[in-house]
């Protein structure tokens, strides 16, 4: 699905693994993020493909879950042939691989890398142009995180990738591992609490058509002071329900 509204606690309970299939940018709101955190903490699993690390940069929990963030990739061309090493062939997702092999894809450099992950495959930067991570360049990994499981593979930029038996078996093995954890258990204590639904809040507009508001302060008596960039200082009086300009610093 491309519908983030599916990220509710009741719906996520139906799935053993949630796949982020080359997502990019911000895809979930705070309610949906909350539901997904609780899903993982209840024993759910995450599977990230390629651009899944180019997703939700401001959500620190997700970065740790995914294992890192996209930093860059080669250009001109962005898709190249590279030499890989399966550094751990005891895992179900890599057991079928030779120790070293070549394949073609778009190779990410990563930042904010989670050093607690267990790396499965690395990339030799001497085998292609414009790599920026140096001698140690992870490309696929897994770990147990915050009560659940997470697996990530950087492969998957090109359509041809999904015609390669080696890649398909790698993905299938990763999915099998991710799905093999304990059953979901929402009855145990979860670190992330539930958020009330948006329709349970009442929103009141106190002022509008502001001219570049910059600062806001709330007094113990409930009055709200806020400034505008051009110098006006305004005050909202909750007893009168009105706004007035109390100073002009222009």
Predicted feature descriptions by range:
Residues 2-8, 34, 134-140:
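Alpha-helical scaffolding within the catalytic cores
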Residues 4-6, 19, 23-27, 46, ...:
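Solvent-exposed loop/turn segments at secondary-structure junctions
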Residues 11-56, 147:
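Short alpha-beta junction capping motif
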